[in-house]
Amino acid sequence: MITRELQLLAYTAEPSALETAAIAALRSIPGLQNVIIQTQDAYLVTFFTSPRPLREHQLKIETLLFIKAALRTFDEQQYLPIPLSALSSSFTFVYGPDINRLPTSQSNELTAILQTRDAREKVFNVERIQHCRLLFFSGPGSEQLNHTHYALLREILCGDLTLYQPFRNELFNSSLDFYATIYPPRFLKDKVRHYVHGDINLNITGAASNYNWASPHTAVTDSEIFRIPYTHVVRFIDRWEIRVRVPDVGFHGSRGVRFRQHGGAAYMCSTLNSTTGATGCLQKGMITSFISQPTLGQLGLITEPMCGWGQQELSATAIQMLTKYANTVEAFAKTLNYAGVPLVQGFVTLSPTLREKRAMAFTGSLSITGLPPYILKPPTAETLDAAMERNRQLLLVEVGYPDYGKGKLHNPVNIMNSESGRHAHILHQALRQLMIITPFGKVIHICCDWQYNEKVTMFKIAKACGDLGLSMSARSLPAHTLRLLKKWNFRNLNYNHRIIKNSWLKVDSAAALVVIADNEYQDVSKKMDIALSGWGCPFHILGNLTPNSNTIVISDKNQYGEIVDIQYKMHMPKQPSEGTEDTPLAPDMSNIQLFKNLDVTEDLLLQVLRHPTVGCKAHIVHHVDRCGNGHIAQQPGVGPFDIPLCDFSVTVHNLVDGDIREGMESVPRVWAADWRVARRLIETQYSTPGLDITDATLANNLGLTYHIPSEHQVTVESKKYGNCIGIGEKTTFTQRDPLLGTILAIVESCTNCILGPVENYEEFLIGLSISVPEGIHYRHEVNSIMAMAKDFCSSMNFGFQVNSAENGNCLLRSVVATANAPCVVPGPSLKPYFKKPGSAILRVNLHTEHFLSGGICCMASGIGASETFTPTPSQLRNLLQFMLIVKAENLALSGHDVSDGGLICAVCEMMFAGGLSARLIIHDEDEEPVFPLFSETPGFVLEVNAIDVAAIIARANLYNVECIQIGEVVESDTFTVFHQNTQLLSVPVSRLKHNWTLFSKSVDLLYVKEDQVLPEETSYGNYEVHLTVDPYSIISQSTTRPNVLVHLLPGCGYPDALLAALTNSGFSPDTVVYPGCKYRHNRREDAAPGSPTADDFIAGIVLYGSSNIDSDVGDSTIRQWLNVNRQVINDVRRNLKAKGSFTLAIGQLACRILFATKAIGFDAGSQQTPFLLPNASRRYESRWLNFKIPEDTKAVAFRDLRGCVLPCWVQGTHLGFSHNNITFFGDLETRQQVAATFNGPLVQSGPAREYPLNPTEAEHPYAGLCSEDGRHLALLFDPCLAFNTWQWQHNQTGPGQGELPVSPWKLMFYRLYNWSKFHQHYRSLLRTNLRHTFNFETQQLDFPHADRRGAVPHDNPQYIPMDAMDPSQ
């Protein structure tokens, strides 16, 4: 019988913040003050074994040695084996995810990579490599420790929401029994989702189809509006078509595409699914692999009240609640790191109806994937008969990574496990490839319900088989089921029947089921093998389809050769019946105390600012990927100080130049460092008599002084088509009145979106994500919400669609609205930060009444309010039209929508973001000041020039919009509020900002050491730019494009920005994406069938990315992966030897790999290379930082940028360099091998030393290193993400100064192009085999091939036209 074995690997580490608290609590007990506690970071490795211990024994040893070698920290400390007996010999405390449950997502990702040792071997079956922590106790008092102290540690370190469990030897269950009991006992359905969206495979139309509505300005049909989250036809969108090149087969796919990608394109991170909306995309597709608490990405709430945030010293209860929230926020942040989607101001909200439930978070997202190319009907009896007539059989094939039973987030058993998103992407692309290369009619049906909630295997088999049955061998069952089965005989029939049903048929599956018609020669199976193997997508044949309708027959022979059958009746999901439980009533508001004369005090304002809904979201925004692979033109951080305030985001569809060029100068059609120019310059460089052209001394400098002629240059960037999205919600109020909450959510989404570069509000497409409890009246409630939303949107001439609908667990009602609109960037938009002292502040209201009920002021004060109103379409239309006029006429300097916290919070946030203050005046004598200041009536706060106030008010009157001047922007340290002449508030801005950021800072402190204090970010942002060259953009097309080989490593996101920057700069990038699994029938050094390698035709190699396994072990594991997938290292080493080619490494993992080649920073004395340091925050950082390019750097790419100080994006968990030989490392600067350094905010600030300007607080603030000859460059920051100025966090040349029209980072790529072209021409001259000195008389030169002179007399001089050797001809 199959069992499990366990090994423990660990190394001594610093205690975590929570462990520090536990140690302090333990030492406070009398007698334990001097106890010695050693903390260790560890991994539990379990593997399956058989009763025969010698079976595969050598392979087991090799696998464990491989794992041991891979588990290393950033400073090369190795995880060493610890005998399990050591855990019992003394008092120890081991805790982590439950070892007797499903492996965690991080474990799955590590195991997947580590099991790729060799394609020719059967790798030993590792079950998990799961992270845990150890505490060893010794010294005085340790003998007193007992189960009471153990319980104390368990209470602190293994709370209800940490999902960690203590581990002891006796708790380890070596059997596999738990696999048979962890799956849900019944089919789980989301009745709300099923009712709203129906089922495409069963031709069940959902109720949403009755409400989805396309406006005249929404260029999609009624049937498409459910699938496509666009508001217009996207004409210019990147076409990343994939061509799988397999020997003897050739290319597949479009040959005319600009970007080429080769076989093995598989290991991708979260790609969104177009068939679900904003909430659904995040919830169902974006939970990345390394999350330990993947309850995020659901619907947008913090579900418990946060207390004690205003205290300087938090109580024990507050710390515990903060810890629970931190787990959630960290997981939510990691969800977005590799997703490549826009983050629209992360927000949290308190719900009055929920208590002690796990926290959740929500972000806006936009899917830009296309529709699947396959819409096939399930097979019928006629289909089977037709196949049999042609001597074919119908086979059912399982495609993809099943991950049985791991997809239900609401199942607490599986809460530690969630698919990373890459599996879904691999499956989606592999199925596309299969449809391209398979002959028509051979793929009968594809059932891919991996994108929905209902993914039960039984349902999927029933849908795939249609009217037919399935006959399969027991050997085709999944491995985890086979491990649980007893011997296949009549005696164990009932037991095996139950195991197959409970562990396979009744659980979720993330795989797709494909029905194919194949013959005895397996023609279709072979093509399937090609298509799916190219993507690294696993598949196996389950069985044959039979005429036995709706029956699954699993058979095999027993030990006597008799056939033993187990039969199951197929089940199809039916339209859910009415609920059995009534929908809970909304809260009774009649007994709530209402405030009438609440005073406006400093304490009230500080309470509101401290509220998590209003407070700063830096703990989220600064620790997630904000750049979306370069597609995001507006992320949450705004203003010179990168304050996360923006409530809309802009996603650009196409990163390649050529979208919109209105207003640009006329430029020549093509540009290039052509042959004629290059040859003359090369000849001039080597014109000294006797100088050999093969002399490499000068070769490296070729092309470094050449500049592209000015007639090809423009000082403006092309505009791009994009999509603007805003989010709105009113979850707290929705508990009381779902219909009014729906309207308020739609209005807020529109007011957010209109601030972006939108030109026509009638192009809005409103998407709704609905969550209601399942009860008797849930259908009526859902229909009422959709009907109300459709009527409101149709009155506004908006398009409307239901993005998602789901069961609101915990009696939760929630409606989140997204407003999408097409836009052009850069375009007129209003950012929420004050820009100019002396400017006027205007309040623009949707309605003259105040809206206070359910607002943040009520929550903070504990006193309710009854003031509400219902917005009308005409009011919203007038408000949006007015805002479009203000933007079009450039009458406003900045703007912010009024929502949570009211007018006063919007003003405070604009002060924080702009570094200025404000003076507010309430003019109405009869009005209580608390009402206008804290009212959450939809509207805007506008900053305008004083001379434009009258013009704006006149236009507001024209559109019947209330517009009132309420104050002015001042350059002061104090914020003041007056009610006529009475001063209500006078508060230092620093105190307001401290309270606004208090919650965010409290969360950040949970990730640092006990004695570590993160400094105030007072110096962050407001950068000064220094240029030594005038930047320009090239719009002309390149004549010939040098090839660049881009290696994407396992776990790294797709580099759209990199490919676009290379393409826009004249290169032709070839991308090789590695799937993390070996290919069959392949040489050891190959990683993908037919993928390109570095050769004379490759101008350079780019290594790109950071691992999505969030630990040092992740990068170390990738390095071990490289030991058996040698193509990357072989390519890099071959490229290092080839003169005239460059290597560029961007990202922490790419830098580590380049350092491993010893090309950069290698110290021959110590035989050491640089290593990377972890961030001081111990978290992923996404920062807009200032960098200086040294004046004397040898880096070829930075030749034009020498001496410049420029800001750029830097993202990752390890953003600093160091070296074991510090003296040698410091000398790199004098050797001119430092390519870039972290710089302070101003040019004269010099090198940055503190966090966050130097994220690791490294002694040597190096951000980029280069080789001795400058050809090879390793960068921690990513210039690709700042290639266009609209990608910049904040575009200014200095504090309070103007903007740059063109990004200087373009010059980096232009220089690489020129350098590469010159070296191509130089190699062409070498290949002509002429004499190696130039005398400028071709008749004196030798003919390259004398034996091919033909009829030309040997004695006659041979004249060779100069252009005859032009390689571009």
Curated annotation (Swiss-Prot):
GO cellular component, one term: viral tegument
Superkingdom of the source species: Viruses
Region (Disordered): 1347-1369
A Pfam match: AIRS_C
GO molecular function: phosphoribosylformylglycinamidine synthase activity
Keywords of this entry: Virion, Virion tegument
InterPro entries referenced in this protein's UniProt entry, alphabetically: Class_I_gatase-like, Herpes_virus_tegument, PurM-like_C_dom, PurM-like_C_sf, PurM-like_N_sf
Cellular compartment(s): Virion tegument
Keyword Protease: no
Main location: virion
Gene Ontology BP annotations: intracellular transport of virus; purine nucleotide biosynthetic process
The protein's name: Probable tegument protein antigen 3
